[in-house]
């Protein structure tokens, strides 16, 4: 919590009140859930769920006071479909928690001029991605995610809250 407070204090001293918040955090634990230490499990949960909660907890009061704000959380495309892999269980469970938190926060702030939504990619193109497995011959690009983010932050999405857009190239509906 102290690190989040320091971050917000720094941003607010340089830029003013936070009225747009994008929670893009993630920690993996690519190991079978039974083989994980409790400490690693908690670290993945803290990075994915707690950090999102703490940043929202810090940003929402000022957004409520301003009667305007935009929050976009980053989830995982498999969460809505119940995709779970025992070899990375804490990540899947944590990102599902982020989506549930998104919906709860959207309901709680709906009368305050704040929208809360989520973007959920499957795989974003990195050097670790395997293009031969990708739908449409490629994984999602950062530009694919930015397009959805820009929509959520635009006036066109003023009445959109509590939603999740999966950016998966149609891959997950085929696999679940």
Task: Identify the meaning behind each predicted range.
Residues 110, 115, 160-162:
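Short, small/polar-rich loop/turn modules that mediate ligand/substrate recognition or access, typified
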Residues 161-176:
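Short C-terminal tail/terminal secondary-structure segment
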Residues 134-145, 156:
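A conserved structural motif in NAD(P)-dependent oxidoreductases
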Residues 61, 107-108, 158:
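Alpha-helical segment proximal to the catalytic Tyr-Lys
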Residues 4, 32-33, 40-42, 130:
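Substrate-binding pocket helix/loop in short-chain dehydrogenase/reductase
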Residues 72-97, 102-103, 107-111, 123:
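Catalytic loop of short-chain dehydrogenase/reductase
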Residues 19, 27, 34-53, 68, ...:
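Catalytic Tyr-X3-Lys loop
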Residues 56-57, 103:
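A short, exposed helix-loop element centered on a Lys and neighboring polar residues
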């Amino acid at each position: 919590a102290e690190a989040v407070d320091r971050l917000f204090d720094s941003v607010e001293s340089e830029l003013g009140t936070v009225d747009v918040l994008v929670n893009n955090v993630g920690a993996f634990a690519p190991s079978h859930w039974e083989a994980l230490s409790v400490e690693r499990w908690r670290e993945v949960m803290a990075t994915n769920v707690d950090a999102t909660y703490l940043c929202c907890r810090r940003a929402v009061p000022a957004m409520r006071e301003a009667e305007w704000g935009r929050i976009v959380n980053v989830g995982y495309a498999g969460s809505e479909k119940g995709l779970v892999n025992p070899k990375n269980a804490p990540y899947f469970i944590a990102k599902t928690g982020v989506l549930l938190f998104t919906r709860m926060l959207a309901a709680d702030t709906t009368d305050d001029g704040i929208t809360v939504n989520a973007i959920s990619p499957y795989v974003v193109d990195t050097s670790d991605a395997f293009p031969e497995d990708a739908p449409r011959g490629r994984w999602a690009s950062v530009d694919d995610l930015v397009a959805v983010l820009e929509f959520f932050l635009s006036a066109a999405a003023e009445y959109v809250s509590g939603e999740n857009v999966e950016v998966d190239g149609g891959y997950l509906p085929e696999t679940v």
